[in-house]
Amino acid sequence: MTLKELVTGFGTQVRSIWMIGLHAFAKRETQMYPEEPVNVAPRYRGRIVLTRDPDGEERCVACNLCAAVCPVGCISLQKAEHEDGRWYPEFFRINFSRCIFCGLCEEACPTTALQLTPDFEMGEFKRQDLVYEKDDLLISGPGKYPEYNFYRKTGMAINGKDKGEADDEAKPIDVKSLLP
């Protein structure tokens, strides 16, 4: 072993110990999750909820667009109809063990009934507990869009009023009068 190899080897050892010393006092990147709260981005896609309109009725009209657009098929629902002609889901089920939280269901929903919240703590011990029914998903408030009411904007007949007669609703367009 030559003197050059000995000095090089000793220098490498000293440099390694110096780097370890620097990293020992540096700020840690690991976040101690349960003790320290996690700051997620404002548009983080977490738990899916069903919202209500300003009148307190559930917004979902059981159009089945969310189930059709879901790439993993974790949403299932059955349509039913009230006496006034308003549609609602008889049952609404999301299997969160299959959900990839892509947000396509929220984008496809015409009534803004499905919304993704920043809540990500959904750990369960049994896989069956990750299947959420309508009662588990339905929240008491309107969510991100507090003033939006689908049935006021769509021009559907509700509660004995014909199309275009409800508050904040324009008269339906007569498409035959548009012809030349």
Swiss-Prot record:
Its main location: membrane. It is found in: Cell inner membrane. [4Fe-4S] cluster 2 binds at C70, C99, C102, C105. It catalyses: a quinone + NADH + 5 H(+)(in) = a quinol + NAD(+) + 4 H(+)(out). It is a peripheral membrane protein. Residues 50-80, 90-119 form the 4Fe-4S ferredoxin-type domain. [4Fe-4S] cluster 1 binds at C60, C63, C66, C109. Its cofactor is [4Fe-4S] cluster. Its EC number is 7.1.1.-. GO terms for molecular function: 4 iron, 4 sulfur cluster binding; iron ion binding; NADH:ubiquinone reductase (non-electrogenic) activity; quinone binding. Binds 2 [4Fe-4S] clusters per subunit. Keywords: 4Fe-4S, Cell inner membrane, Cell membrane, Iron, Iron-sulfur, Membrane, Metal-binding, NAD, Quinone, Repeat, Translocase, Ubiquinone. The keyword Metal-binding applies. GO terms for cellular component: plasma membrane. GO terms for biological process: aerobic respiration. Belongs to the complex I 23 kDa subunit family. NDH-1 is composed of 13 different subunits. Subunits NuoA, H, J, K, L, M, N constitute the membrane sector of the complex. NDH-1 shuttles electrons from NADH, via FMN and iron-sulfur (Fe-S) centers, to quinones in the respiratory chain. The immediate electron acceptor for the enzyme in this species is believed to be ubiquinone. Couples the redox reaction to proton translocation (for every two electrons transferred, four hydrogen ions are translocated across the cytoplasmic membrane), and thus conserves the redox energy in a proton gradient. This is NADH-quinone oxidoreductase subunit I. It comes from Proteus mirabilis (strain HI4320).
